[in-house]
């Protein structure tokens, strides 16, 4: 039954979901005979295999499947100890690290720490000299965990991720292991796009190069899902690109997202589809700001709404309200003010309950701008003042200057001259210190209006 389960686990023909269910059934049948007391080794092996099957399972709740995988791996480790079975122990530690990296339940930060511990334990046995392929693959997994790590210094974690990816590439060369090489190029691109150290322009260019390298192997025909993942990542890199023509970079990003959506369909990959729709919406908004095509903002709004429908069904409330916030901003930019206010007020209520001032402050600012635009000036002033108070608490001087400028402009309109002067002078000082000529020109124009008032 164990061998049959392994055959189904690796099977290429037939539906992948069906094969995994058959593998799980076979492993469970073998466990009815192989008990930990009578056949400890034979019992432990299918536990590890069962963990792998649950990790990859398509049917059932993803969160439940990962919990079952973690239980199975830990049961296996009770028998397959480092001293008695070092190779098997290291393999299970690597598998356990993968399960913790993907885990949905529990605290995300803690899960990633557990993954990093498991990978490092695996590397105590999987050395480069003894097991080069396994060592390189575990370095890859460790790099991904460091890229996603929440604890510790973000900049340091990303440097550790880049080191791990480059170590992996010393073994996983394009000629010897093309699939793994492409995967590593994709992961390296992800680390560079987020990198804090080094020159930001060069980091983005390196990320684009890595993604383009990955796509030489990750083709639509050979590896459609991997191809879609890298297309989405490349789209993100073009969206952030500083070099080159802005309009051209935006067009390249849109093409990448649209390519990814050929594979990431709503039915087959709802979460990936939603995230790519969100990325596409962000980029369409940028094109709308650049070219003013109404169809772009309308399409962006539609993409946000569709993406939000999927995210609403998940347990990720933070992501759902972030999508709502961006939808509210898009509605504002498109001139749909009533609907924009409705969405942003819903977000405001959530973040007030959570006492999340870093998310609440920009929402209050957007609402202030909306109320200002729609002529509800006193309400706008209150929201500007509330957002200003929070930005001061956060020490966000750039947004403090932005709010004091907007508030000063509003106060000129409602005749609060002394308050307007005070706020505009504060913003003027900040922009002088930062040599922001464009914003200074705006402030000086408003101060001239004040002098003639």
Each language-model region and where it sits:
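Conserved alpha-helical positions within TPR/SEL1-like repeat arrays
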Residues: 2-10, 41-56, 87-102, 133-148, ...
């Amino acid at each position: 039954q164990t061998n049959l389960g392994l055959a189904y686990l690796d099977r290429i023909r037939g539906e992948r979901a069906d094969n995994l269910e058959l593998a799980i059934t076979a492993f469970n049948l073998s466990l009815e005979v192989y008990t930990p007391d009578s056949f400890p080794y034979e019992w432990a092996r299918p536990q590890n295999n069962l963990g792998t099957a649950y990790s990859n399972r398509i049917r059932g709740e993803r969160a439940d499947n990962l919990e079952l995988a973690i239980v199975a791996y830990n049961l296996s480790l009770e028998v397959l100890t480092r001293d008695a079975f070092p190779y098997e122990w290291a393999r299970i530690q690597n598998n356990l690290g993968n399960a913790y990296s993907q885990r949905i339940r529990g605290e995300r930060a803690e899960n990633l720490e557990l993954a990093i511990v498991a990978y490092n334990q695996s590397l105590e046995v999987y050395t480069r000299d003894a097991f080069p392929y396994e060592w390189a693959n575990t370095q890859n997994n460790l790099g991904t965990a460091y890229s996603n790590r929440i604890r510790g210094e973000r900049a340091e974690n990303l440097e550790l991720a880049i080191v791990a990816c480059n170590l992996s590439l010393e073994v996983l060369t394009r000629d010897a292991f093309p699939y793994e090489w492409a995967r590593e190029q994709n992961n390296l691109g992800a680390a560079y796009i987020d990198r804090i150290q080094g020159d930001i322009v060069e980091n983005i260019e390196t990320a684009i190069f890595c993604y383009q390298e990955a796509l030489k192997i990750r083709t639509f025909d050979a590896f459609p899902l991997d191809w879609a993942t890298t297309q989405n990542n490349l789209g993100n890199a073009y969206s952030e690109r500083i070099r080159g023509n802005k309009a051209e970079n935006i067009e390249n990003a849109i093409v990448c997202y649209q390519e990814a959506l050929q594979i990431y369909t709503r039915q087959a990959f709802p979460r990936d589809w939603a995230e790519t729709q969100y990325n596409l919406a962000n980029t369409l908004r940028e094109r709308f700001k650049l070219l003013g095509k109404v169809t772009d903002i309308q399409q962006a709004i539609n993409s946000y709404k569709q993406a939000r429908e999927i995210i609403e069904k998940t347990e990720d409330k933070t992501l759902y309200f972030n999508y709502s916030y961006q939808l509210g901003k898009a509605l504002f930019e498109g001139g749909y003010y009533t609907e924009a206010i409705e969405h942003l007020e819903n977000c405001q209520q959530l973040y007030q309950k959570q006492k999340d001032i870093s998310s609440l402050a920009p929402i209050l600012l957007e609402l202030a701008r909306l109320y200002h635009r729609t002529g509800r000036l006193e309400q706008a002033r209150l929201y500007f003042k509330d957002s200003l108070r929070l930005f001061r608490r956060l020490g966000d001087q750039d947004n403090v200057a932005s709010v004091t400028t907007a508030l000063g402009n509003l106060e000129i309109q409602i005749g609060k001259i002394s308050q307007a002067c005070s706020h505009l002078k504060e913003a003027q000082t900040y922009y002088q210190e930062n040599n922001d000529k464009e914003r200074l020109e705006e402030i000086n124009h408003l101060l001239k209006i004040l002098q003639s008032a």
